[in-house]
Amino acid sequence: MGKSCKVVVCGQGSVGKTAVLEQLLYANHVVGSETMETLEDIYIGSVETDRGTREQVRFYDTRGLRDGQEFPRHYFTFADGFVLVYSIDSRESFKRVEALKKEIDRCRDKKEVTIVVVGNKLDLQDQRRVDSSAAQQWARQEKVRLWEISVTDRRTLIEPFVHLASKMTQPQSKSTFPLSRNKNKTSGSLDS
């Protein structure tokens, strides 16, 4: 296990950010239980990667954003990854995720950062307001992975977080530059 990765979990209020983390890390979500507004919590978990290694991840569970509220800038500077959460029964929450993605790109100056998007409340299909294929098309265009999940089915939570941990802790790729010196001792000139 290497360094601890820092992941910021963000989205509109009441989309289930805390419930996702509680269920993922502790299998501790009771459907219908009373919810409380989160100010900020930090969860530390060990997530297995697709390489079979376990990585420590520090999840920053952020306050749900309300209309007109900006996302605090300090989160953009230290995060190794982001989980953007929306609820499939709320078009506004998906629009908030679209805006957050733009904000991350702008604040990080398009620097490499791992982002996954999760559409929560898959169990509320009859109340769906976000078209699944349109959301997937947006995700492909933005070059992020998107999963639809439900905290009522813990198995749906595993793949997005394994992907996240795997991408953030990917071994550095090998250099394409040759390591040995050129055996032909010609001058360094580029002229033919």
UniProtKB/Swiss-Prot annotation:
InterPro entries: KBRS (IPR042227), P-loop_NTPase (IPR027417), Small_GTP-bd (IPR005225), Small_GTPase (IPR001806). Its main location: cytoplasm. Pfam families: Ras. GTP binds at residues 11-18, 61-65, 120-123. GO terms for biological process: negative regulation of canonical NF-kappaB signal transduction; Ral protein signal transduction. One of its GO terms (cellular component) is cytoplasm. The keyword Metal-binding does not apply. A motif (Effector region) lies at residues 35-43. SUPFAM superfamilies: P-loop containing nucleoside triphosphate hydrolases (SSF52540). In contrast to other members of the Ras family, the members of the KappaB-Ras subfamily do not contain the conserved Gln residues in position and 65, which is replaced by a Leu residue, and are therefore similar to the constitutively active forms of oncogenic forms of Ras. This suggests that members of this family are clearly different from other small GTPases proteins. Belongs to the small GTPase superfamily. Ras family. KappaB-Ras subfamily. Atypical Ras-like protein that acts as a potent regulator of NF-kappa-B activity by preventing the degradation of NF-kappa-B inhibitor beta (NFKBIB) by most signals, explaining why NFKBIB is more resistant to degradation. This is NF-kappa-B inhibitor-interacting Ras-like protein 2. It comes from Danio rerio (Zebrafish).
